[in-house]
Curated annotation (Swiss-Prot):
A Pfam short name: PRA-CH
Reported function: Catalyzes the hydrolysis of the adenine ring of phosphoribosyl-AMP.
Similarity comment: family membership: Belongs to the PRA-CH family.
Class of the enzyme per the UniProt entry, highest EC level: hydrolase
Naturally occurring in which organism (per UniProt): Leptospira interrogans serogroup Icterohaemorrhagiae serovar copenhageni (strain Fiocruz L1-130)
Protein name, as recorded: Phosphoribosyl-AMP cyclohydrolase
Length: 187
């Protein structure tokens, strides 16, 4: 198994408010689960590189609106969580200085793809854009939250949110009631 870093979001239920964001190595995930309170739920994104742990005991973070860049170095990346107006978590990606600048300037979400090593505007090819309503940051300024108006779907699998399944005991998946707005074309 290749070692990769994954993003962990603790989410307060039932409000689905973000309580924390941290990055760990994938092989540390089973040990991380052992530190969580009994009765947590686990939702996983389509690429299996971001995990939401949901529990009533997680305390939500305080967020403030921001119009400033979090990064000023060309090589730095900051986690960015996209949510809709109701607070539903749509996806998690990364931003660099250029993507943040374009997001602020255009009002549409731009990200930096680590796998392609390039800047991208969400929806540039699909038309499934994210119009930014506001940009939030926790008081420690460790990541950004783009509250967006999502066109069609955030997930390349056709789901409104990338978090459309819950991991059950072991490796069993349960589909969540997340609308699937299109079927992706097979290549």
């Amino acid at each position: 198994m290749s070692s990769r870093e994954i993003t962990i979001l603790k989410i307060q239920e039932p409000t689905r408010s973000i309580a924390s964001l941290t990055r760990i190595m994938e092989e540390e995930l089973s040990q991380y689960r052992k530190t969580l309170p009994k009765g947590f739920r686990e939702e996983v994104d389509c690429d299996e590189d971001t995990v939401l742990f949901l529990h009533v005991d997680f305390l939500p973070l305080d967020f403030q609106k921001t119009t400033e860049l979090l990064l000023t170095g060309k090589k730095d990346l900051v986690p960015v969580v996209a949510i809709d107006l109701q607070g539903q978590i749509l996806m998690q990606a990364f931003g660099n200085e250029e993507s943040q600048t374009l997001s602020l300037k255009t009002g549409y979400a731009h990200y930096f793809s680590r796998s392609r090593n390039q800047l991208w505007k969400k929806g540039d090819t699909s038309g499934h854009t994210q119009k930014i309503l506001q940009i939030l940051s926790p008081t420690d300024r460790s990541f950004l939250v783009y509250q967006v108006e999502q066109e069609v779907a955030a997930c390349h699998e056709g789901y409104y949110s990338c978090f459309f399944r819950e991991r059950m005991e072991g490796v069993t998946w349960k589909l969540l009631p997340v609308p699937r707005n299109f079927l992706p074309e097979k290549s």
